[in-house]
């Protein structure tokens, strides 16, 4: 990984432990040049700082870089922006803007100043910054493994000077991911009060800067780990460092470190590694995050968030290494300053505690409606929509119940010192309990992974259920269509069978009628003759009957009847004659009747044979019907096979 050191690292180191103090009533003056606000360098005054290490370390710079380091590295989280914003000048205009700088005290506007702290007022020369930034590059790294995390982190072990080409274009901000959930933040940053460092209660004064009253700033320091989650803030910071490494006037747009602060942090690296190796490894574990998953800008609380599931596999890019190395160095420098009680930034306990409480009370509101964004001029304030969180000066004024633009004495804020300190100590995570927080964070990460796997399995189950339901519905539709087709085929076959049966019955009736007609056609002549014979026979029978009646009924059988024998003889003889005549006619008719009888016997025999033949025909018809049904079924089966 490669880390770019600003111009303050190239300036010779001098001993500035006890310089004369600044006058707090002096106000920084600004001048507009080349479309941007330039701060006027003040007179050569050195500022004593209780945060500077008393040990012999390279931590001082010249007068021109003192104000720059105060404005950038003292806060590392508050980005000062003027009320009127201008785009940063191009690299091609750097020489012109540097040569045209005119610092006139009378032409600069006055700015409001905070009570307890002094604003930075000087900006170093552009050409000096560019030369220093191109001379100092850390090029070699070594990958280690954290025991409780298992992730690799970068640890600078050597230095090598190389030339770096300033980037004139800026990349687009990559897609931001969601911040760490509140549950993971509570697990990863559980406070342990008995392990707090002595300087932990004074962190607010070393991490806050009162900006211009007309501007707004964003606190991206240690409280950002609670406000937005380490992953979100780190991603925003790293995206900004990748998009704007060097601006047109030679200054680093990130605004985290600069001047003597960067030199001090770079030189205090090795001492901090030996003093707090665990903390150094804890802070470094987040600096191997990818360009979309990095920690916040060098904060110790941001290092506590490295177990929250936001650190992913790293891609060692030069710009990523540049930002992470600066975060690590700045964190070591600020941790060392917290133990030093000689800095003027901690001179006012009331302002320090009020700044801490104001930042801490703003964290919950800031976590829900202020995602951090990056702009061409650096980190801008949160959401530029309906609601924008106030700058630290306004938060300080809210916490102390005093106006933001007026100067209040320290006595006004001493009333709530104990309550604010207790609240801060209850919610401030300990640095020494980092491994436990990492374990809890890994537990939360495992839960998140389990929930993610459960969601994936549930989605897969839903997909399979949907596929099975769709297949079942398709099969059901096919089954219904097949059943409908079979039903229609059965109906058509039944209708066809009924029609065939009716046609067969009609055919049988026609055949019987034809047979009867053929038989009766031969007997019609005999029947016509029989009618004539029957008429004559009936006439003769009627005459014989009348003669017998007349002869028998009129005979006096009793009652002493007297008959003439001659007359009786004649009557009987006449009757016999009639009988003989009738016998002759009867004989002639008998022959005809016998012939008719023989014909009728033959007819009976023929009808018997016909009945037998009809029974055989009926059996044949039943067999033909069964065979026809089989034939129809075979035909329908052949038709279905041909369609498929």
Swiss-Prot record:
<keyword id="KW-0576">Peroxisome</keyword>
<feature type="compositionally biased region" description="Basic and acidic residues">
    <location>
        <begin position="172"/>
        <end position="190"/>
    </location>
</feature>
<dbReference type="GO" id="GO:0005874">
    <property type="term" value="C:microtubule"/>
</dbReference>
<feature type="short sequence motif" description="QWRF motif">
    <location>
        <begin position="463"/>
        <end position="466"/>
    </location>
</feature>
<protein>
    <recommendedName>
        <fullName>Protein SNOWY COTYLEDON 3</fullName>
    </recommendedName>
</protein>
<dbReference type="Pfam" id="PF04484">
    <property type="entry name" value="QWRF"/>
</dbReference>
<dbReference type="InterPro" id="IPR007573">
    <property type="entry name" value="QWRF"/>
</dbReference>
<feature type="region of interest" description="Disordered">
    <location>
        <begin position="162"/>
        <end position="252"/>
    </location>
</feature>
<feature type="compositionally biased region" description="Polar residues">
    <location>
        <begin position="290"/>
        <end position="302"/>
    </location>
</feature>
<feature type="compositionally biased region" description="Polar residues">
    <location>
        <begin position="91"/>
        <end position="112"/>
    </location>
</feature>
<comment type="similarity">
    <text>Belongs to the QWRF family.</text>
</comment>
<feature type="compositionally biased region" description="Low complexity">
    <location>
        <begin position="53"/>
        <end position="77"/>
    </location>
</feature>
<feature type="compositionally biased region" description="Low complexity">
    <location>
        <begin position="397"/>
        <end position="412"/>
    </location>
</feature>
<feature type="region of interest" description="Disordered">
    <location>
        <begin position="290"/>
        <end position="414"/>
    </location>
</feature>
<dbReference type="GO" id="GO:0005777">
    <property type="term" value="C:peroxisome"/>
</dbReference>
<feature type="compositionally biased region" description="Low complexity">
    <location>
        <begin position="343"/>
        <end position="370"/>
    </location>
</feature>
<feature type="region of interest" description="Disordered">
    <location>
        <begin position="1"/>
        <end position="129"/>
    </location>
</feature>
<feature type="compositionally biased region" description="Polar residues">
    <location>
        <begin position="314"/>
        <end position="332"/>
    </location>
</feature>
<comment type="function">
    <text>Probable microtubule-associated peroxisomal protein required for chloroplast biogenesis and for the formation of the prolamellar body and prothylakoids in etioplasts. Not involved in peroxisomal metabolism, including mobilization of storage compounds during germination, fatty acid beta-oxydation or photorespiration.</text>
</comment>
<dbReference type="GO" id="GO:0009658">
    <property type="term" value="P:chloroplast organization"/>
</dbReference>
């Amino acid at each position: 990984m490669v880390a770019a050191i600003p111009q303050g690292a190239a300036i010779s180191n001098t001993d500035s432990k006890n310089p004369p103090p600044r006058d707090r009533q002096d106000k920084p003056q600004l001048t507009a040049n080349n479309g941007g606000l330039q701060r006027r360098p003040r007179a050569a005054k050195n500022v004593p700082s209780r945060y500077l290490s008393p040990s012999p370390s390279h931590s001082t710079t010249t007068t021109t870089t003192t104000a720059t380091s105060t404005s950038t590295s003292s806060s590392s989280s508050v980005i000062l922006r003027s009320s009127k914003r201008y785009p940063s000048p191009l690299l091609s205009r750097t020489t012109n803007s540097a040569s045209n700088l005119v610092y006139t005290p009378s032409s600069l506007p006055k700015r409001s100043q905070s009570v307890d702290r002094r604003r930075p007022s000087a900006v170093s020369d552009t050409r000096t910054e560019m030369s220093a930034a191109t001379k100092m590059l850390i090029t070699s790294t070594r990958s280690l493994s954290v025991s409780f995390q298992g992730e690799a982190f970068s640890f600078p072990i050597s230095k090598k000077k190389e030339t770096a080409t300033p980037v004139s274009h800026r990349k687009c901000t990559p897609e931001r991911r969601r911040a760490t959930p509140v549950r993971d933040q509570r697990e990863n940053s559980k406070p342990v009060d008995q392990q707090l460092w002595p300087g932990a209660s004074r962190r607010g004064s070393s991490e806050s800067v009162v900006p211009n009253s007309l501007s707004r700033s964003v606190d991206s320091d240690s409280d950002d780990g609670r406000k937005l989650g380490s992953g979100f803030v780190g991603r925003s910071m790293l995206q900004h460092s990748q998009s704007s490494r060097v601006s047109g006037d030679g200054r680093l747009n990130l605004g985290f470190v600069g001047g003597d602060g960067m030199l001090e942090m770079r030189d205090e690296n090795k001492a901090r590694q030996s003093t707090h190796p665990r903390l150094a490894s804890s802070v470094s574990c987040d600096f191997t995050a990818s360009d979309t998953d990095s920690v916040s800008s060098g904060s110790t609380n941001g290092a506590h968030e490295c177990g929250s599931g936001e650190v992913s596999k790293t891609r060692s890019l030069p710009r990523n290494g540049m930002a992470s190395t600066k975060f690590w160095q700045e964190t070591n420098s600020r941790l060392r300053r917290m133990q030093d009680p000689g800095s003027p930034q901690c001179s006012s306990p009331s302002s320090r505690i009020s700044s801490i409480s104001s930042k801490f009370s703003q964290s919950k509101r800031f976590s829900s409606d202020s995602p951090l964004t990056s702009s061409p001029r650096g980190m801008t304030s949160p959401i530029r929509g309906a609601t924008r969180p106030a700058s630290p000066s306004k938060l300080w004024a809210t916490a102390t119940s005093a106006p933001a633009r007026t100067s209040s004495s320290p006595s006004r804020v001493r009333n709530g010192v104990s309550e604010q300190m207790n609240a801060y100590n209850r919610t401030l995570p300990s640095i020494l309990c980092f491994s436990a927080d990492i374990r809890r964070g890994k537990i939360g990460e495992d839960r998140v992974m389990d929930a993610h796997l459960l969601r994936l399995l549930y989605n897969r189950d839903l997909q399979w259920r949907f596929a099975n339901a769709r297949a079942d519905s398709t099969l059901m539709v096919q089954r219904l269509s097949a059943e409908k087709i079979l039903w229609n085929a059965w109906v058509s076959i039944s209708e066809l069978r009924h029609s065939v049966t009716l046609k067969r019955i009609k055919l049988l009736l026609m055949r019987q009628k034809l047979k009867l007609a053929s038989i009766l056609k031969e007997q019609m002549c005999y029947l016509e003759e029989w009618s004539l014979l029957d008429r004559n026979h009936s006439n003769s029978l009627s005459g014989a009957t009348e003669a017998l009646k007349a002869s028998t009924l009129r005979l006096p059988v009793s009652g002493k009847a007297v008959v003439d024998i001659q007359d009786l003889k004649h009557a009987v003889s006449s009757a016999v004659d009639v009988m003989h005549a009738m016998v002759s006619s009867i004989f002639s008719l008998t022959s005809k009747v016998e012939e008719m009888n023989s014909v009728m016997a033959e007819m009976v025999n023929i009808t018997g044979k016909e009945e037998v033949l009809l029974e055989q025909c009926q059996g044949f018809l039943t067999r033909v019907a069964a065979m026809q049904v089989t034939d129809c079924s075979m035909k329908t089966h052949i038709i279905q096979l041909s369609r498929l």
